Amino acid sequence: MSRYKYTEDNPLKVFTAFSGYDSQCLALDRIGIPYELVGWSEIDDNAIRAHNALYPQYAGRNYGEIQQIDWKQVPDFDLFTYSSPCTDWSAAGLQRGGAEGSGTRSSLLWECRKAILEKKPRFLLLENVKALVCKKFIPYFNKWLSELEDYGYTNYWKIMNAKDYGVPQNRERVFCVSVLGDHDIYHFPLPQELELRLKDILEPEVDDKYVLSDTAIEGFLKHNLNHLAKGTGFLFKPKEVDLPEEQRICTSSKGNGK
């Protein structure tokens, strides 16, 4: 955005869909771009509480369900972020896909079309799981990019890994930046050398409360059945590993579908 000058008197106007606690705003704070959050869209109670704790000044600007938003009533904005639910793309979920009209959570991506056509924001930012561009799902992604091109956007996308940008986690995600009209060519940031690694953070002795008990594992497995019955959510997939106890790290892919 170096070509565009945003100041305290002329801040970047932002709308975040599927906001969560709005890591997008945290990023803008970190890189020092003045902005105003003209609106956000979130329905998860816990995420809303976290958002309001971080940004109390914007507590009254949550537009709720994206399907119900009348975009004519929303102030104009320059940046639209739309990291729609990954539940039905993710390898940790049921991979039901996100075809338009399918009713899956991931199909909410197509609801963003209304916002883009009505407000024509200068910048779009999408982040989602790597599976979005796998062989099974990339036709949906390509169709979406083609639509954006029809609307006048140029798209730049890349699979990026958190470990290449200063975070000691192997976390690959798809990022897509779309720019409306004439603009300077966008370049994704170059990878950085990782200075902090997981071994620098983990404690040599771990309290028992951080180790999953047999009872907890059984509870997670039962929770799987509820998700499967509803056709939603991530699944808990325990894996037996033959490692010395001091080398084991207990994790799960349990989630609430967000």
Predicted regions and their residues:
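Nucleotide donor/acceptor-binding cores
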Residues: 12
